[in-house]
């Protein structure tokens, strides 16, 4: 009786396996860019209490005048985060901003963990990708 049931439903299981396999492969393909994206960014913070952040438009104009393309500038947790298309542009912008802003501000590379953060939230052990 059990053998007859298994034999009768075997083609349906094979079909569902062949349907599930492309769905999983497509899902993995769609998730790859999000998992391995390296967002190049700088974060500017005031080095002393009471100092205000530089104007984002002023920073944009200064970096654009130097030929540095900026993807976005956003305020984020008492800092200014500037995103770039490439690591080279980020390093060039860091040099320009260190001269421009002198010692009033801390300039550091900003590592965005949002792409892999969801993996760390569902896992017992933190993951490091890349």
UniProtKB/Swiss-Prot annotation:
Q: Does the keyword Transmembrane helix apply?
A: yes
Q: Which GO terms describe its cellular component?
A: plasma membrane
Q: Residues on the Cytoplasmic side?
A: 1-15
List keywords of the entry alphabetically: Cell inner membrane, Cell membrane, Membrane, Transmembrane, Transmembrane helix
- Give the transmembrane ranges: 16-36
Which family does the record assign?
A: Belongs to the MzrA family.
Protein name, entry field: Modulator protein MzrA
Organismal lineage: Bacteria, Pseudomonadati, Pseudomonadota, Gammaproteobacteria, Enterobacterales
